[in-house]
Amino acid sequence: MAARCVRLARRSLPALALSFRPSPRLLCTATKQKNNGQNLDEDLGHCEPKTDPPSADKTLLEEKAKLEEQLRETMEKYKRALADTENLRQRSQKLVEEAKLYGIQGFCKDLLEVADILEKATQSVPKEEISNNNPHLKSLYEGLVMTEVQIQKVFTKHGLLRLDPIGAKFDPYEHEALFHTPVEGKEPGTVALVSKVGYKLHGRTLRPALVGVVKDA
């Protein structure tokens, strides 16, 4: 009896094994589900936000801004240097021109002494003695006058002008007051007497005129 039961059990084992073996269709479906799960995970992984590095356009814009700032600073420095150079050129040119104009001041002052002597010489000659009866004195006087006129022409040619301000308003930049005195019929503050004429060189007072000024009585 026992041996019969054993034989029946051996015969039933293959059938039971087949009943528990999964079918190919089920295996294929499981494989597809597994693959779909992996693909879904990969898709979800691709959808995760990522931090991108700075783009090339942004870098180029930053470099452009830096270069523009450097260019602006360089242009400002260039303009300042150009302005400084122009100012220096103008100052140098002005100094050269002033040296040309006023470099002869010392020489002119020496010539003024000669002009003063000529003026005093012509003024010292008695006018009543200048006649044909005294030809030597007349010739000498006329020679002095011609020399004085000629030297004044030379002065004018080189920008040296004579100041004889008799009757003019007193100007402290051109006149030097030796005294103040009331003068009848004269306006106070005007020049009543010129003791020594003055001179201007190219508009600048070289020697002030020595004068007497009218004051209120």
From Swiss-Prot:
Modified sites of kind N6-succinyllysine: K94, K120, K215
Q: Which InterPro entries match?
A: GrpE, GrpE_coiled_coil, GrpE_head
- Location in the cell: Mitochondrion matrix
Q: Name one Pfam family in it.
A: GrpE
GO MF term (any one) = protein-folding chaperone binding
Outline the subunit composition: Probable component of the PAM complex at least composed of a mitochondrial HSP70 protein, GRPEL1 or GRPEL2, TIMM44, TIMM16/PAM16 and TIMM14/DNAJC19. Binds to HSP70, HSC70 and HSJ1B.
Q: What is this protein called?
A: GrpE protein homolog 1, mitochondrial
Q: Which organism is it from?
A: Mus musculus (Mouse)
Gene encoding this polypeptide? Grpel1
